[in-house]
């Protein structure tokens, strides 16, 4: 992940030099952010971001129920409200039915035995989010409103994607999600990032599938280690043991041409930047302004500070 920022922008970090948490400017990390030769056991990065918490979001009435959308993005027909599933994964179909979609048509492929299910009303709902048109192929993607939905809704969306196009490596506590869609690859990473989990991505050249179909597109495999249960309905994809949270390291710095930036300040002191939601520190511009004002016009300004926003707001309410 890349973040454009000023050299004096501050970051809340874990400093491995001092084995403690700290707030440090970007330019202060550049001289000694790593030691040892790369790709050796002695190589290490010294500055790491804070652990990321889940993005709360809010419960929404979504055009397509999250699990069904995830299942369709994984195993659905691009131009119809169809899902393709094997007989052993019939639980996925039952889960879609529980979202309110009845089976309109059902067929079984004579060679592979894969079952085809068309659901009544699914295509109409998918068209509300700009997908599933019969006259042209759409770009499968996760609509923006789903990224800010509630935690439970985003979990259901993730479960639908993993039940269809995911695989579980239980010994490594890791899920792999595979797709040939470039945008869906990016959207999946963004979705996983809303839970504070980091991903790794690998690319694989087209190959012959287990069903005998020759692939024609590059396959993207996104891997991540969750720290809590994901509500998958396929039994073999239900993870029982979980990884501990891991910090993200600063692994490189590059000077770029100056560009327009904005100072941001939020109540909590830390906000998330970039598509991968990297924790970063508040702007200190307001503090500098108040200091300047008190120094230059002490006769017209007064400042009240407190360790609690409720106390501070209460004080000004009484005034």
What are these regions (language model features)?
Residues 183, 188-189, 216-219, 226-227:
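Terminal recognition/anchoring or ligand-binding modules at protein termini
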């Amino acid at each position: 992940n890349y973040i454009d920022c000023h050299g004096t922008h501050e970051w809340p970090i874990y400093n491995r030099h001092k084995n403690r948490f700290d707030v440090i400017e970007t330019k202060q990390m550049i001289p000694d952010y790593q030691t040892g030769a790369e790709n050796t056991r002695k190589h290490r990065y010294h500055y790491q971001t804070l652990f990321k918490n889940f993005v709360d979001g809010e419960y929404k009435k979504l055009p397509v129920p999250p699990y069904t959308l995830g299942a369709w993005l994984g195993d659905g027909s691009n131009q119809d409200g169809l899902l393709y599933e094997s007989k052993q994964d019939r639980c996925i179909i039952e889960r879609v039915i529980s979202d309110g979609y009845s089976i309109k048509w059902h067929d079984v492929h004579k060679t592979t035995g894969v079952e085809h299910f068309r659901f009544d009303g699914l295509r109409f709902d998918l068209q509300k989010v700009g997908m599933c048109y019969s006259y042209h192929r759409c770009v499968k993607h996760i609509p923006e409103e789903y990224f800010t939905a509630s935690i439970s809704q985003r979990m259901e969306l993730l479960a639908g994607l993993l039940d269809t196009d995911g695989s579980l490596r239980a010994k490594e506590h890791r899920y792999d999600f595979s797709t040939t869609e470039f945008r869906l690859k990016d959207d999946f990473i963004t979705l996983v990032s809303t839970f504070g989990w980091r991903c790794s991505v690998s690319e694989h050249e087209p190959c012959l599938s287990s069903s005998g179909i020759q692939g024609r597109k590059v396959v993207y495999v996104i891997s991540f280690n969750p720290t809590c249960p994901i509500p998958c309905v396929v039994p073999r994809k239900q993870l029982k043991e979980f990884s501990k949270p891991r910090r993200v390291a600063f692994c490189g710095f590059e000077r770029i041409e100056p560009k327009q930036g904005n100072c941001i300040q939020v109540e909590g002191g830390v906000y998330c930047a970039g598509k991968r939601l990297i924790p970063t520190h508040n702007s200190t511009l307001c503090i500098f302004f108040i200091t300047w004002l008190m120094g230059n016009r002490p006769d017209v300004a007064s400042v009240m500070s407190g360790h609690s926003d409720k106390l501070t707001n209460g004080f000004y309410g009484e005034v």
